[in-house]
């Protein structure tokens, strides 16, 4: 049985797509090993079929500290890969992949890199010259070296299986006057209907780096929104840190709206089912999931994201009229409230965005697996 190594770490945004790819490859008869770092250890579940290996590389701004750490990590990776004898190594970018990718190059194992974002990251750009193929999620990608263009294959991103099973969400088009429900998207294979049939549902999540801002901004925006339209029927589903939940719930209770506030949602598919609109950061995996199910979003990119890639992701979708980009440095509760009200008042805008998203959808798990098999 041929062995394939996947390398991803740092955040769930890198981890879960790689696991989804691994599950597809296992179905095709391959033995899949996954090298990740300590930060992603929390995401590993017993029912995951890939074989995990923890290889941690701590970052340091001090080059004299980082180089010895990198050297040790590379030696460990060489030993690991030498014993496995993989047919190919696939890296998803970010510094956790550095040591295994160096090891693969040293052992002459073919490498493929996958760039989830619309901006080629520094690590992927460095390894581009060594890669057999470069899989990308977006047809338009920034920071791509000229020599690498011949290696490019557009596969789209990889979406988790439980999200893929949703197929297409039947969105709700609710005018402020009628509150009526009509289907925006006809089912391709199946339809999942929101549980809150009469309420316009907004799902807000920001990840570990974004929840604090959203805990302050979103309730303030909803307050303004309800002041402008007191008769509006809303359902708010929001991710928030434990320390912020009491204050948020108090605000929503006083507004007399339906809400659910939690620190973490184990199964995002359940929340996606209900949502008519998402407010989130603009990480690649989030965008791929929303694209796959045709769920429009207002994106507030994380300014500190590497190479400002979240801004480029969100702006690309805004340019294609598949989403809306509001920059954190320029946003206010009033501006966000106005944008939400505009979308609720003009359901055709949501309908068009949803349809445009579905036009972008790709079966990334299959296309990337096909590419890997070509290299093998």
UniProtKB/Swiss-Prot annotation:
It is an enzyme of class 2 (transferase). It catalyses: di-trans,octa-cis-undecaprenyl diphospho-N-acetyl-alpha-D-muramoyl-L-alanyl-D-glutamyl-meso-2,6-diaminopimeloyl-D-alanyl-D-alanine + UDP-N-acetyl-alpha-D-glucosamine = di-trans,octa-cis-undecaprenyl diphospho-[N-acetyl-alpha-D-glucosaminyl-(1->4)]-N-acetyl-alpha-D-muramoyl-L-alanyl-D-glutamyl-meso-2,6-diaminopimeloyl-D-alanyl-D-alanine + UDP + H(+). This is UDP-N-acetylglucosamine--N-acetylmuramyl-(pentapeptide) pyrophosphoryl-undecaprenol N-acetylglucosamine transferase. Its EC number is 2.4.1.227. Coiled coil: none annotated. Keywords: Cell cycle, Cell division, Cell inner membrane, Cell membrane, Cell shape, Cell wall biogenesis/degradation, Glycosyltransferase, Membrane, Peptidoglycan synthesis, Transferase. Its main location: membrane. It is a peripheral membrane protein. It comes from the Bacteria. Cell wall formation. Catalyzes the transfer of a GlcNAc subunit on undecaprenyl-pyrophosphoryl-MurNAc-pentapeptide (lipid intermediate I) to form undecaprenyl-pyrophosphoryl-MurNAc-(pentapeptide)GlcNAc (lipid intermediate II). GO terms for biological process: carbohydrate metabolic process; cell division; cell wall organization; lipid glycosylation; peptidoglycan biosynthetic process; regulation of cell shape. It comes from Rickettsia rickettsii (strain Sheila Smith). Pathway: Cell wall biogenesis; peptidoglycan biosynthesis. It holds the Pfam family Glyco_tran_28_C. The keyword Cell cycle applies. Belongs to the glycosyltransferase 28 family. MurG subfamily. One of its GO terms (molecular function) is UDP-N-acetyl-D-glucosamine:N-acetylmuramoyl-L-alanyl-D-glutamyl-meso-2,6-diaminopimelyl-D-alanyl-D-alanine-diphosphoundecaprenol 4-beta-N-acetylglucosaminlytransferase activity. UDP-N-acetyl-alpha-D-glucosamine binds at residues 11-13, 117, 160, 208, 310. SUPFAM superfamilies: UDP-Glycosyltransferase/glycogen phosphorylase. One of its GO terms (cellular component) is plasma membrane. It is found in: Cell inner membrane.
